[in-house]
Swiss-Prot record:
Protein name: NAD(P)H-quinone oxidoreductase subunit O
Reactions catalysed according to its record: a plastoquinone + NADH + (n+1) H(+)(in) = a plastoquinol + NAD(+) + n H(+)(out); a plastoquinone + NADPH + (n+1) H(+)(in) = a plastoquinol + NADP(+) + n H(+)(out)
Subunit text: NDH-1 can be composed of about 15 different subunits; different subcomplexes with different compositions have been identified which probably have different functions.
Membrane topology, as annotated: Peripheral membrane protein
Top EC class for this record: translocase
Signal peptide: none
Gene Ontology MF annotations: oxidoreductase activity, acting on NAD(P)H, quinone or similar compound as acceptor; quinone binding
Main location: membrane
């Protein structure tokens, strides 16, 4: 018998988010973050429902503008996901 490779297939990397992308916040990633600990204990639902527009990407952070009369926010890029 031939040896078979039983290792799991490599996960595909998600597409990199770029300026202008429509995004929403990943609830699980945000809830476990230091940003959530430093913010209101009940975050607004619109950040998880989306869409928000990614305005600027600097290093590990992105500035998001929501389609509401609220200030833009900076969040870690690993807390953001593509809005679909």
């Amino acid at each position: 018998m031939a040896d078979s490779d039983t290792s799991a297939p490599a996960k595909a990397k998600p597409a990199a988010l770029r300026k202008g992308a429509l995004v929403k916040v990943n609830r699980k990633a945000y809830s476990a973050s230091i940003e959530a600990a430093a913010s209101d204990p009940t975050p607004p639902d619109y950040i998880f429902d989306g869409p928000g527009e990614l305005l600027v990407v600097k290093g590990d952070y992105g500035q998001v503008r929501w389609n509401r009369p609220v200030p833009d926010v900076w969040l870690r890029m690993d807390q953001l996901e593509v809005y679909s």
